């Protein structure tokens, strides 16, 4: 779809959506996003120019259907997929991608760490994906030196980052905010550093006693991103891994640096979103969102959960969806899904489905709470169908139509029950929605009540 659009930008040194927006140019991607979001295209342009919205759209990902991440747009959901050294292959990863898109993922991150040729896996995912693809290039950098962290050089990082950009990756997690002076701040934590990328950088700095190479070479990464319109997803290496560690000095020190890096990227018209926690008690979620907006000049916030309690392994799609809905309500732009397998193992197809649906619920609830235009229309349509016992319409409007129909049909599978004015919960005699009160009956009641009130007042 975008082949002709990007062809017109050949030969330009900066092809980012922010660069065009700041020049007053409305790109085809901005126009497409405006229609998808039902927002004025001028608003899209202004939000991108300001940095409060990003349109992750690498010029080499031409089959992409452009979308927006920002406080003015609908709350988005990301799904993680990826092969590991112990499982998965190309076909399985493409299947996970298509499953993620089917159940509503707005973006997908390929977090592959093994399981075959990572370049081949990534290229297959990008070629099959209509949604933006994100990666964490440090994983492949580590794989390129066979897991020997101390052997990594800044050039290794830059080489892998450019390769991902050339292949069409739309946004990359760059762990540039973890500075060597922040490492002692994790001593009082229960779970230390829980970011895989952050852990790699921390070990590198501890071995070499040198500053984070992604920080010292940040300007070189900016130059790569300008050429391909790759968006930064600034990684929160010091995100809390349990509720005890939330909002501590380590997390907030890194957040301040992420804000500085955000503005540095903006000086070169490169798009940025900022990643956030993690594990956060309910009473600290609003603070975390507002603090990010303050420190990062309202760049879009992209959070993992957050989980609001640590005691429910096997159910962390629920513990985190609670936090995600609250974070979205307070202004978080994108939610990274968590599956029931979080902390336990690699998710399968059913885990991906359950995680995504939980997060689509959270994002939609946030849109309703923020009074986004049209956010509740689907709810109202489904409620009307429910009241009218239009079962097929209810299934159609559900976030997961297959699951809704499956549960209904467990007890009432025959087609005749698709027009029945009851379900198996109440049966045919006790459903309160059978009590249809029409306008004429209400008018008669109002007349009666008015007369009754008049008689009482005359006594």
Swiss-Prot record:
Residues reported in the UniProt entry to bind substrate: 80, 109, 139, 175, 195-197, 236-239, 275, 302
Annotated S-S bridges: none
One Gene Ontology biological process: thiamine biosynthetic process
Source organism of the structure: Synechocystis sp. (strain ATCC 27184 / PCC 6803 / Kazusa)
NCBIfam families per record: PRK09284.1, PRK13352.1, thiC
Record's keyword terms, sorted: 4Fe-4S, Iron, Iron-sulfur, Lyase, Metal-binding, S-adenosyl-L-methionine, Thiamine biosynthesis, Zinc
Enzyme class: lyase
The protein, known as: Phosphomethylpyrimidine synthase
Enzyme Commission number: 4.1.99.17
Binding site for [4Fe-4S] cluster: 423, 426, 431
A Pfam family reported for this protein in Swiss-Prot or TrEMBL: ThiC_Rad_SAM
Keyword Oxidoreductase on entry: no
Keyword Ubl conjugation in record: no
Cofactor(s) the record lists: [4Fe-4S] cluster
An example Gene Ontology CC term for this record: cytosol
Annotated pathway: Cofactor biosynthesis; thiamine diphosphate biosynthesis
Cofactor note: Binds 1 [4Fe-4S] cluster per subunit. The cluster is coordinated with 3 cysteines and an exchangeable S-adenosyl-L-methionine.
Family to which this protein belongs: Belongs to the ThiC family.
């Amino acid at each position: 779809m975008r082949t002709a659009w990007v062809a017109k930008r050949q030969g330009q040194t900066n092809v980012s959506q922010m660069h065009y927006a700041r020049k007053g140019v409305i790109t085809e991607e901005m126009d497409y996003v405006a229609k998808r979001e039902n927002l004025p295209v001028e608003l899209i342009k202004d939000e991108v120019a300001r940095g409060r919205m990003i349109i992750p759209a690498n010029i080499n990902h031409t089959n992409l259907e452009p979308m927006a991440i920002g406080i003015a747009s609908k709350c988005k959901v990301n799904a993680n997929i990826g092969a590991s050294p112990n499982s998965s292959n190309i076909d399985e990863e493409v299947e996970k991608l298509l499953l993620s898109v089917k159940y509503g993922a707005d973006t997908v991150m390929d977090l592959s760490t093994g399981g075959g040729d990572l370049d081949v896996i990534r290229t297959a995912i990008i070629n099959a994906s209509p949604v933006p693809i994100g990666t964490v290039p440090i994983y492949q950098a580590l794989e390129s030196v066979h897991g020997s962290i101390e052997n990594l050089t800044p050039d290794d990082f830059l080489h892998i980052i450019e390769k991902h950009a050339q292949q069409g990756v739309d946004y990359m997690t760059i762990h540039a905010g973890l500075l060597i002076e922040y490492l002692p701040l994790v001593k009082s934590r229960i779970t230390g550093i829980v970011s895989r990328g952050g852990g790699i950088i921390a070990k590198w700095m501890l071995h070499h006693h040198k500053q984070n190479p992604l920080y010292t070479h940040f300007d070189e990464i900016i130059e790569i991103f300008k050429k391909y319109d790759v968006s930064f997803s600034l990684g929160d290496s010091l995100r809390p891994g349990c509720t005890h560690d939330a909002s501590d000095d380590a997390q907030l020190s890194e957040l301040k640096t992420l804000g500085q890096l955000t503005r540095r990227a903006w000086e070169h018209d490169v798009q940025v979103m900022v990643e956030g926690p993690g594990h956060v008690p309910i009473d600290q979620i609003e603070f975390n969102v507002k603090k990010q907006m303050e420190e990062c000049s309202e760049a879009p916030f992209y959070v993992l959960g957050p989980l609001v309690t640590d005691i429910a392994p096997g159910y962390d799609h629920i513990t985190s969806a609670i936090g995600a809905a609250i974070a979205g309500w307070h202004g978080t732009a994108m939610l990274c899904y968590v599956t029931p397998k979080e902390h336990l193992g690699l998710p399968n197809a059913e885990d991906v489905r359950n995680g995504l649906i939980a997060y689509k619920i959270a994002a939609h609830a946030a849109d309703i709470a923020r009074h986004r235009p049209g956010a509740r229309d689907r709810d109202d349509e489904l409620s009307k169908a429910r009241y009218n016992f239009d079962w097929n319409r209810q299934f159609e409007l559900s976030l997961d139509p297959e699951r809704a129909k499956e549960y209904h049909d467990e007890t009432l599978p025959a087609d005749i029950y698709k027009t029945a004015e009851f379900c198996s919960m109440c049966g045919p005699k006790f459903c309160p929605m059978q009590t249809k009160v029409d306008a004429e009956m209400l008018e008669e009641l109002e007349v009666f009540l008015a007369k009754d009130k008049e008689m009482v007042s005359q006594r």
